[in-house]
Amino acid sequence: MGKTSKAKQSKILRQGSKKAETLSKKISPNTKNLPDHHFKLVKVKRGLDGLGLFAGEDIKKGEIIIEYIGTILNKEEAEKVTTSMYLFEVNRNKTIDGSVRWNIARYANHACDPEGNAESDIKKGRVFIKAIKNIKEGDEILYDYGEEFVKEYIAPKGCRCRAVKHDYGAKGHVSK
């Protein structure tokens, strides 16, 4: 395959975001009372820990960046999934399996406070990644995955975020 120009990549990502937004409306219940969101341009490239999600434009504090989308699972279905690292528990009875290719929000990496610049925001059964700080174009989008996930999956290997202090007992912190 040949190289794709930056302009074409941007166009693809914008189309991908629109496609993902449309697909999320089809598979996410309880969305009729939510306004349509115009998501920010984001890029996937090598980041802090593997692939990462990066701002393709300046993003202001409080703006919704992207929606975390995927297959909606009930509690029993989610408990049977053993191969996905992209499960996002919305509530006790609903989980989103974000391992689908068109969910580029899954590339937002973890950061311990205060290094994160985004947070998850759950509204009417949908999960959005929202800026908690101004984010400049080119900055990696990072948020705290939460204590349970960090203790189970990140702490045993050592957290690789840039934070000086890790509240979840992460060991083997790798400084950048």
Where are these regions (language model features)?
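C-terminal SET catalytic tail plus cysteine-rich post-SET Zn-binding segment of SAM-dependent SET-domain
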Residues: 2-12, 17, 112, 117-176
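Catalytic cores of histone-lysine modification enzymes
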Residues: 13-119, 174-175
